[in-house]
Amino acid sequence: MAKHEQAVPQSKQQAGSATSSGVSGATRYEHVGEEYLERRRLRKSAGWILLWALGVGAVISGDFFGWNYGLAAGGFGGLLIATLVVAVMYVCMVYSIAELSAALPHAGGFYSFTRNAFGPTLGFVNGVADIIEYVVTPAVVVISIAAYMQTLFPEVPLYVWWILYYVIFVGINALGTELTLRVGLVVTLMAMAVLIIFYIGAVASGAFSWALVFNIPPEPGGSMFLPFGWYGIFAALPFGIWFYLAIEQLPLAAEESHNAVTDMPKALIWGIVTLLALSLFTLVLNSGVGGGAAEVGESAAPLEIGFQSIFGEGATKIALTVAALTGLVASFHTIIYAYGRVLFSLSRAGYIPRWISVTSATQHTPHRALIVGGLVGLGLAFLIDQLGSASTVGAALLTMSVFGAVISYALVMISYIKLAISRPNMPRPYKSPLGVPGAVVGTILALVSLAATMAIETNRPGVIGTAVFLIVMIVYFFVYSRHKLVAQAPEEESALLEAAEAELRRH
């Protein structure tokens, strides 16, 4: 540690806060001086509208691509039912984390909630699952961005676009949280405008047809609504997740919210309402244009099919490319914000190297965490390119982001249930109207979605990749970082204080 971050001698601290036990076994905490946290300070910059845009922007690329492969897996009916099931899971989760983010407004988000419920080990596991989701996803998205850019500038190598987009958007994130969130608002509104233009155009032009929605030939035992039978619903679940994946990143902005107690629940709830509406319009209208569900379900650019069916094949390549890029850029930009905060919070608490969490002196943004995540993302982009985007590794990385997300969903809702039982008197400025029953339903649906992700054979490499990374990080935790945790990190401090008070009550 640098001299201004020296640990405070244990004798000057309460003895009861030096160690922690539970599902994790013994952990050891170091007590740091005030300068440590001062060098890791975030700036409050967000009201609920900017938070809403952060959440919706992170997800909105899922309305542009990815979801449509569920048509090939389950047909329109299978994907529709799967999307509704997944929507119930997300609503249950959003209400649960709205309550937790108001009660525990820390930058750690899911890691903080699970750490307070089950201790450092499972808290760290949830944090690592978030790292997988938020670091891998931008790498996959930037490859799609570069592919679109190459249609306009074929002479420019793909890697130039990867580097350029990472430099631009990591740079924006590093220049200030308020700038980051305002840019996020602009690109999110642009992406929503593109979708709304498509919705109106599909209906007004007559391009949409219900016959096209149900044009996938049914297999034996299937129907026009469920061409692949009831199993098609199960197989389509991972693709329904694309419509909502990453709304859960919002609690990571708690320490940068002007009033997390009121703004965070409001932004989360309005965010999921917005995404529910967009998902249904996209699913129905985009499935019924062009060559219908049969063509859209196999396309890498389903929205492009939609716009061509409205405006004709002569629609300019530039217009279609810009339209597609808005959604991709919105998610790329906002998920960079997310990985920066996950790495920052885990580093500040000592789970990963502490130097990563130092913030910039003037803007108080986690610039080191942003750069580290960006370098890893770029490395993954080069890896995917070298081995082929359709290769086992490329597909595995896509699956890892979804698999990591679903693991974190199950853990956070189980944490909600545990905290409701073990800490009933914890101040909860906002309470989920669904309460524990909602969290139970959400947990069950998350586990079903986890099973669906594992059941698809092509997803197995991603499942293995996630498991390997989790095991490596857990070994790192037990061998090294569990002895280096920081007692004054907000996520740890609240849990340690509760543990100390519980110990006093027992005596």
Model-assigned labels for residue ranges:
Residues 1-78, 90-91, 95, 107, ...:
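Membrane-interface "cap" regions at the ends of multi-pass membrane proteins
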Residues 41, 183, 356-364, 406-458:
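C-terminal membrane-solvent junction of multi-pass transporters and transport-like membrane proteins
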Residues 64-161, 271-277, 281, 408, ...:
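Extracellular loop-to-transmembrane helix junctions
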Residues 85, 395, 399-400, 404-405, ...:
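A generic transmembrane alpha-helix motif of multi-pass inner-membrane proteins
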Residues 112-113, 119, 151, 155, ...:
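TM-loop-TM module centered on a large, flexible mid-protein loop between adjacent transmembrane helices
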